[in-house]
Design a protein with these regions (language model features):
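ATP/NTP-dependent adenylation/nucleotidyl-transfer catalytic domains that generate, transfer
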Residues: 1-22, 27-291
């Protein structure tokens, strides 16, 4: 993923990246990868808190930016959200998605005004289930972790911190441009990704008390089903024979099938698994064939 981002930026003449920093694990890992690829000084992290953002998430975003030496700006979205709501008076999912789309506008404003590559931070589990906001958190020109399941995101984040603890600084990965294995720029306290970003329950923080598990099966289970359904092409009967319960199988298959239209519009990114969305797996956008 780091090499893919580094190579894409070099071949398309991008010197830096911008992304939203929510304090969550996905944006933290993507920012860390960007720092390893082009240096923290070329990463522009934007915190865009709302009335639902926790103090812990704000602190985690700031800690991540400080750890990797990134530029860090805070752009609260509540004034913009209130302006939209004064005219639109949205409720429910529409109001939640409005927050994500305001953030997307801000990220793209940084990209356009500073000549930066906007990077999307969605993972494969979210893309599979359509757990993203089109024209919101799905904006960008490149998506470094789009082929990593959520459980893999956690695994890589823990590995990167372990590597940092034993001296692998920013840019210390053995990739093109660092073939000799320079240790890179030392990290403060030997930590790259805030531990709290790794350990806390995932949440989009678009409404009070929201958790990913409100809308999706727990990731430990979800990713097992997704791996068999997507990467091993197991159908419904196969998944049931694999030991997954009927309700979970039907829910996951329905979510995946209905989200094809979103995946068609998602930014490109590296292929790191046996079967990635896009060229490897293209199903019809219309999905009534399941019925």
């Amino acid at each position: 993923c780091v090499l893919g981002l580094k190579d894409y930026m070099a071949k398309n003449h991008f010197k830096g990246v911008c992304l939203g920093l929510s304090g969550g694990i996905d944006s933290a890992l993507v920012a860390a990868m960007a720092a390893d690829a082009v240096g923290g000084e070329n990463v522009y992290g934007i915190s865009m808190p709302s009335m639902y953002s926790s103090d812990g998430s704000k602190d985690d975003a700031a800690d991540l930016a400080r750890n990797i030496g990134a530029h860090y700006d805070i752009q609260p979205i509540e004034p913009l959200f209130v302006s939209f709501q004064n005219q639109l008076e949205l409720e429910g999912v529409a109001a939640e998605n409005l927050q994500a789309r305001i953030r997307g506008v801000i990220v793209m404003a940084y990209s356009n005004s500073k000549g930066l590559l906007a990077v999307a931070t969605g993972n494969k589990s979210e893309l599979a289930c359509g757990y993203s906001t089109i024209y919101g958190d799905a904006v960008g020109g490149y998506a470094p972790i789009k082929d990593l399941l959520k459980t893999r995101v956690w695994e890589i984040s823990r590995w990167r911190n372990k590597a940092a603890a034993v001296g692998m600084g920013i840019g210390g990965l053995h990739v093109v441009g660092n073939e000799q294995g320079s240790a890179g720029t030392p990290l403060p306290d030997g930590v790259m990704i805030p531990v709290n970003s790794i350990e806390k329950a995932p949440s989009a923080e678009l409404r009070p008390g929201q958790k990913d598990s409100d809308s999706l099966p727990e990731y430990a289970l979800l990713d097992q089903v997704l791996a068999m359904y997507i990467e091993h092409a197991h159908g419904r009967a196969d998944l049931l024979a694999d030991g997954f319960d009927e309700a979970t199988v039907d829910t996951v298959m329905r979510l995946v099938d209905r989200a094809e239209w979103k995946r068609r519009q998602y930014p490109l990114g590296p292929k790191v698994t046996a079967l990635a969305f896009g060229r490897d797996r293209r199903l019809p956008v219309t999905n009534a064939f399941r019925e």
